């Protein structure tokens, strides 16, 4: 891998290709050994190639603006690593990975991907209708990372627990691109809601007549679109080997979809496949290595922003009382549940928060707030745990 990386860096124009190739390969090897084992992690040659390709683009861009020094080459390569890798790391692995970068590239500094005009458009779209969202720097960073991943790869996966904002990330990015003058068309489908033949199409063995499926029909539509129009085929649902393996040739450098009828559909650089799912346990390593990853963790969720947004929907007369009770009781109760982790039915942090808030909507007295909170947050606990939880909540409410 060192030799491959060295040759690739030389072709991209790096003068210190040998030294940088050793460092970047060491970083990938140590990351594979030291970071947690996650299904969506890929430390192979495809991921390395994506980093080197981004580094080459950044180098060309930097040389167009000023003279590039030896130290600046390392900084550009670190920036390429951050752009391609930080988006897929879990909350706990991120700090470990950044420490590895600091050890392998001592003294070199770098920053995340710069948003520029796109970031300005994202902020404007988030605050305007129909989104009306509270600005969240982590979420904005994920949107910029998704844009970079879509530019790098044909296929991208937005993976994370239910309610973490996966749909919001790509929908806001789409609106921001349109705001910036880029035409974007989207085809959304749930592959798990239909049989394979209805998704990918089938051939009648008697008449030899081909019938398009939902995905193949969308594929025909996007290849007809003008080159200046960005087209996204969004698959919202579980990534299943039954149909995803058929797209492997699309997701690699060939960009070809071969139908069972023998017909081939070739996609241009303006087409992307975007997969939105809660996990990748059924996807093969071959599929994962072909796609860019945007991982949204429960820890990235800002619970106070979520609660503040809900509070704005309440009556003005109750809002000040609710704000005080939320601060004094709700957050303590939520932290207590997170520490317990004894839910009867597995749920996410966002799901737990929304359950609790739904039960205290419209309350006007402290007693009704406490009773509603116990009902909402404690409804997913066993009888004994619910009793202990209720005692704690009543103690905080005194």
Where are these regions (language model features)?
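Alpha-helical lid/collar subdomain of P-loop NTPases
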Residues: 1-156, 292, 306-398
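Conserved catalytic/switch belt of AAA+ P-loop NTPases
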Residues: 204-207, 216-275, 298
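Short glycine-/polar-rich loops that comprise or flank the Walker A/P-loop
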Residues: 2, 153-154, 182-185, 229-230, ...
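Conserved RecA-like P-loop NTPase ATPase core
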Residues: 44, 146, 199, 247, ...
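The Walker A (P-loop) glycine that initiates the GxxxxGKT/S ATP-binding motif of P-loop NTPases
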Residues: 160, 201, 237
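A short helix-turn-beta junction within AAA+ P-loop NTPase domains corresponding to the substrate/partner-engaging
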Residues: 1-2, 184, 252-253, 283-312
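AAA+/P-loop NTPase substrate/partner-engagement loops
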Residues: 176-208
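Walker A/P-loop
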Residues: 156-189
């Amino acid at each position: 891998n060192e030799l491959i990386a060295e040759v690739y860096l030389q072709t991209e124009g790096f003068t210190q290709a040998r030294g940088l190739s050793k460092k970047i390969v060491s970083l990938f090897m140590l990351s594979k050994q030291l970071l947690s084992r996650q299904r969506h992690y890929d430390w192979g040659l495809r991921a390395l190639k994506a980093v080197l390709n981004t580094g080459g683009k950044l180098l060309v861009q930097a040389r167009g603006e000023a003279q590039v020094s030896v130290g600046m080459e390392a900084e550009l390569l670190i920036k390429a690593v951050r752009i391609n890798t930080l988006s897929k790391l879990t909350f706990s692995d991120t700090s470990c990975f950044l420490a590895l970068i600091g050890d392998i590239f001592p003294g070199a500094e770098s920053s995340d991907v710069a948003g520029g005009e796109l970031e300005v458009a994202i902020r404007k779209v988030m605050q305007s209708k129909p989104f009306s969202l509270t600005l969240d720097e982590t979420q904005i960073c994920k949107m910029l990372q998704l844009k970079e991943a879509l530019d790098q790869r044909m296929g991208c996966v937005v993976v994370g627990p239910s309610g973490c904002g996966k749909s919001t990330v790509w929908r806001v990015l789409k609106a921001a691109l349109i705001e910036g003058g880029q035409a974007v068309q989207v085809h959304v489908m749930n592959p798990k809601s239909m049989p394979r033949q209805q998704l990918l199409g089938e051939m009648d063995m008697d008449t030899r007549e081909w019938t398009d499926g939902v995905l193949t029909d969308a594929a025909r539509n996007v290849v007809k679109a003008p080159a200046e129009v960005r087209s996204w085929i969004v698959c919202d649902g579980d990534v299943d080997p039954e149909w995803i393996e058929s797209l492997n040739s699309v997701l690699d450098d060939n960009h070809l979809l071969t139908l069972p009828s023998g017909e081939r559909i070739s996609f241009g650089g303006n087409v992307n496949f975007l997969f939105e799912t809660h996990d990748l346990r059924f996807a093969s390593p071959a599929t994962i290595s072909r796609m860019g990853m945007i991982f949204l963790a429960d820890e990235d969720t800002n619970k106070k922003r979520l609660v503040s947004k809900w509070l704005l929907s309440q009556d003005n007369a109750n809002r000040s009382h609710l704000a005080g009770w939320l601060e004094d009781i709700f957050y303590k109760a939520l932290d207590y549940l997170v520490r317990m982790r004894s839910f009867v039915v597995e749920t996410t942090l966002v799901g737990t928060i929304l359950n609790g808030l739904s039960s205290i909507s419209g309350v006007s007295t402290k007693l009704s707030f406490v009773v509603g909170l116990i009902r909402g947050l404690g409804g997913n606990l066993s009888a004994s745990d619910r009793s202990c939880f209720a005692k704690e909540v009543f103690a905080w409410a005194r």
